[in-house]
């Protein structure tokens, strides 16, 4: 979605700045600030995501600087890349906007926003929205041989303890 918005804005000589992005089930919510002009390097925020169907390796390439895809983690020749895009590969959240929302005196009033919305803002502020790679919990469960997807909190904790980013 952001990739399409960016391409449309660029055709008009405008730039974009994602303010916040999140999903509610199958619905994606995106808030974008339109800019009068492209910002330096903005064109490097559109790219392709390749994912190996066998081993799950993921690689991102900037659309402007495409090269050949590297080998995945599969034994020689066993893997196959599935390429998606063009996609927005830049940040999905603007931390200043999120901090301003959380610090707004009106939102501090009792009942101004729900606890669920407060938690969402906290999660968005903690998640920079990059890199542009992702794993679905049901796929992780399938690959690990579990009976079903693990609890999201347990999964995030385990991934962080292993030294990786998870939100």
Predicted regions: what they are:
Residues 1-167:
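SAM-dependent transferase fold signal centered on methyltransferase-like domains
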